[in-house]
C-alpha cells in the first residue's frame, strides 16, 4: 500500500486508537504490524474473524487474557539450559493460565449456544495447549510474590525447618546478652550484618564486650558486633542457608528444564493468544465507534451510507452518503474551502483502508466497500483535517509519482487539484489529470474550488458533481455533502449579509459575465430542489418507519392473542382430563360394586337398574374423550360423496356436497351460498341423527352369548366413531356380565376400524390382554380381548 496515502490518511493514528483496545503488549505489537490487505479473499477472511469476535463480545465478553506477556525469550533460554528466575517462571505460568482460560471460555460459549459457529476462532483456539503440568508445577513451587515455597521439595522443607530452629537458638542466646550487658549497648535490638546476627555496642566497650566486629555506624560511636556466644550457631546458619540456596537453584533448574521441553507449544500459545487479543481489539474498537460490517464486492464499488470519520467526535461529525464506482467512477467536489471537502476525501480513503485491514466501518447498514491494490492520495504535506497548507510544487511532485503507478485497481484521492497556480492553467491541468486517471479505469474522488470544473461533471460520462452545503443565513458551512450539485462561491450573498453596500455588490455582479451569473443561479436552484427532495425523502422514511412500527405492534398483539388462546385451550384440556379421570373412577366404583353384589348373590333387579343408571351418568364424558383421542390418533378424516347431505358445524347449517377440491376441502351448497369447507368442519346428517338416537337408548348393544366365558360384537359396516361408541357400551356390559374373554369382529377393509379398536383397548384399564385372531378365529378381521 502507498506509504504517502497511509500517512496523509492518518493510518498510524488509527492503529494507535486500535492498540488502546488490546489487553496485552503482545496484542499491541500485532496492531503496530497491521497493514491493509490487497487480496479480496484475504480481506474476506479478516472481516470474518472480526465478525466472529464481535459475536463473542456480544454474547459474552472479551476473551480473558489476564497475565499474557511475551515469554518467548525466556522459553528460548530455557531450551538451551538456562535457569529462569522465579518471576520469569511465574510469567510462563501466567501465559499457560491465560491459554487455559481462553479455551474454557470458548467451550462454555459453545455449551451455552449449541448452534453457534465460530470456525476461524475455533481453529486458532484449538492450537492452544493447556500444559496443566507446567502451570501446576510452577504454582506449587513458587508463590505469587516470587518466593520458592517450603512445599517445593521435602529437602527444602527440612532445611528451612533446621534454619528456623538454629535462628531460634541464636535469638535465645542474644536475648541473654541483651539482658546481661545492656549498659554496653547503644540500643537493645538485634540486627543483621553480613547475614549474621549482631548487636549495637558502644565504641568504648569494644574490648570488654568481645566478639567479632562486622560494621560500625556512620559516626563511629557504635559497633555492630557478633557476640562470641553465637558465632558457632551463626556458622551453622550460614551452612544451612547455602544448602537452601542450592536446593532452590535445583528446583528452579528442574522447572526451567520442564519449560524448555515444551518450548514449541508455549511459543504457539503466545502467538495465538496475541493474535486473539488483536482480533478482539478490532471488535471492541468497532463497538466503540458504532461501526457496522460493510458488504464486500469485487467490482471496485464504494457505497457509503451515513459514513463518519472515526477521529471526529460524535457531537461534531456530519455523516456523508456517497457512491463511487457504479454509475459514476469519478466524483468532483467543488465549492469554497473550509466546507468539509477534505474531510470527505479522508473519510472515503480511511474507511477503505479500515475494511482492507479487517475493521468494521463507522457508517449505516448497507454500506458497501471493495478491495483495491493501491490507494493514492494527494492531500498535501503535513496537512491535518482542519488545514490545507500544500503548494503547487508539492502537489505536482506527488501527482507525478502517483501517475506512474495508477491503474484500474487503484483508488485515487485528489485534494484541491490544480491549486497553487494560475486559475485558468490550474483548472485546465486538473481536467487533463482527471481525464487521464478516468481513462485508466481507476476510481477517483477530487476536490477543487475552481469554477471551471463545475461543468466537468455534466460534460463527462461517468463523472458526478458534488458540493458541500453552505448556510448563507449563518454564514457557515453545514459540512453536508450534496451529490449532483456543483459548489457555489456564495461571495455576493455573504458580502451582502456582512453589510457591504448594494451598489458595490451590483457593480461586482456587472464584472461577472452573464453566463457565469446564470450558472450560479442554476446551481442555487439545484441546491434548493435537492434540499426539497431530501426533505420529502426524510418524511417518507419517517412514514415508512411509522408503518413498520405499527405492523410490528399488530404482530405482537396477534402473538399475544394466540398465546392467550393456547393458554385457555390448555386449561380447558386440563379440566377435561380431570373430568375424564373422575368419570373413570366413578365407573370403576360402580362396576366393582356390581361385581361384589353379583358374587355375593345379593343383587336385586332394582339395585342393578340403579347401578346401571349411575354408570351411564358417569360414562358420557369419558366415552367422548376416548373416542376423540382414538379419532385423533387414527387421523381418520371423514369422507363425503357428491350430493350427500351434510351439516356445516362452524355455523350450524345443513347443505349438500357439490364436489371435493384439490386441496382436500369440499364445496358445499348451503341455501343460496356455495362455501369451501374443511372435512373436519363437516358432519354427516345421518351420523348426527344416529348419535341422537343412541343417546336415548340405554342398552341397545346386543351381546350374543356363545359360552359361559365368551361374547361377540360385530362392527363390520359401521363407521369408526359409531363403532367405538358401541364398543364402549359393549365393554361395560361384558364387565357387568363377568365375561373373561370377548371377541370384536371388525373385518379387514381399510384397517381404520381395526386401528381404532386397538387404540381404544390400549387406553382401557379393564383390558388384561388383546390380540388379533389366529387361524380358525377369524384372522386379522377379529380382535380377541381378555378382561381383568
Curated annotation (Swiss-Prot):
Xref: SUPFAM superfamilies: DNA repair protein MutS, domain III (SSF48334), P-loop containing nucleoside triphosphate hydrolases (SSF52540), SMR domain-like (SSF160443)
PANTHER family: OS10G0509000 PROTEIN (PTHR48466:SF2), OS10G0509000 PROTEIN-RELATED (PTHR48466)
Record key words, sorted: ATP-binding, DNA-binding, Endonuclease, Hydrolase, Nuclease, Nucleotide-binding, RNA-binding, rRNA-binding
Subunit text: Homodimer. Binds to stalled ribosomes, contacting rRNA.
Record bears the keyword Transcription regulation: no
Location of the region described as Disordered in the Swiss-Prot/TrEMBL record: 688-708
Any single biological process term in GO: mismatch repair
EC number of this enzyme: 3.1.-.-, 3.6.4.-
InterPro entries referenced in this protein's UniProt entry, alphabetically: DNA_mismatch_repair_MutS_C, DNA_mismatch_repair_MutS_core, DNA_mismatch_repair_MutS_sf, MSSS, MutS, MutS2, P-loop_NTPase, Smr_dom
Residue stretches making up the Smr domain: 713-788
HAMAP family: MutS2
Record-given protein name: Endonuclease MutS2
Amino acid composition bias (Polar residues), ranges on this chain: 699-708
UniProt lineage: Bacteria, Bacillati, Bacillota, Bacilli, Bacillales
